[in-house]
């Protein structure tokens, strides 16, 4: 088993719950937090001793990698509220800039040529570094397509800091996927919903490593 930095998952919605659950399935410890503490405590109880509930401040302080699994529209305020705690942290952003559309489905809430990753990278607290990951697949696929055999499904990620590879790729493998890095946060738009490398976009499905590389 690869060594893994201390991980906190903040936000116990569908994505956050799946990521925390998958980490425990891989026998990795995870810190979990939610603005509603009872949700984090209930999930930790169901996952067992590898999951530790904390309040948001404590979760950030204790972790090296912070998976911020909250709605895109709330992240700017989150950065402001926890700017001191987030200094120097590695922040993993799985958000998609979406809202419910009239008649069903989702619509993009930023300009078509913008990405959540690029917008958030300009708002980072001092010394924090951003990685865009876990955004190209639905919560259902993050659960059902994890740990596939004999070949794992790919999880794309984007970051301007290639030096984060040794921390991010073990995390992605621990969640049950094969990591594949894109060239910087500017590529976030490709892996966010409607992007050409997204399940709900150009790909229409999960892909193997060979299939993914053919799309780059």
Task: List each language-model region with its residue ranges.
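General beta-strand structural signal in soluble alpha/beta enzymes
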Residues: 53, 92, 129-133, 180-184
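Rossmann-fold NAD(P)-binding glycine/threonine-rich loop
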Residues: 95-140, 144-146
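Phosphate-coordination loops involved in phosphoryl transfer and adenosine-cofactor binding
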Residues: 3-6, 88, 152
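Rossmann-like NAD(P)-binding element
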Residues: 48-51, 56-90, 94-104
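Active-site-lining helix/loop region of Rossmann-like oxidoreductase modules
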Residues: 152-216
């Amino acid at each position: 088993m690869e060594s893994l930095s201390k991980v906190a998952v903040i936000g116990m919605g569908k994505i956050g719950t799946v990521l925390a659950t998958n980490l425990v399935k891989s026998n990795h410890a995870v810190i979990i937090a939610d603005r509603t503490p009872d949700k984090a405590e209930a999930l930790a109880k169901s996952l067992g001793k590898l999951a530790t509930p904390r309040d948001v401040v404590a979760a950030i302080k204790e972790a090296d990698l912070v998976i911020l699994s909250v709605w895109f529209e709330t992240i700017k305020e989150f950065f402001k509220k926890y700017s001191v705690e987030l200094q120097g942290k590695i922040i993993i952003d799985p958000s998609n800039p979406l809202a419910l559309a009239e008649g069903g489905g989702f619509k993009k809430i930023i300009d078509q040529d913008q990405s959540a990753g690029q917008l958030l990278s300009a708002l980072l607290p001092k010394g924090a570094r951003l990685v865009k990951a876990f955004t190209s697949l639905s919560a259902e696929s993050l659960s059902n397509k994890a740990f596939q055999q004999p070949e794992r499904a790919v999880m794309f990620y984007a970051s301007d800091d290639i030096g984060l590879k040794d921390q991010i790729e073990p995390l992605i493998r621990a969640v049950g996927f094969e990591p594949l890095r894109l060239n910087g946060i500017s590529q976030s738009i490709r892996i966010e919903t409607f992007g050409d490398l997204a399940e709900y976009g150009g790909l229409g499905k999960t892909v193997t490593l060979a299939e993914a590389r053919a799309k780059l």
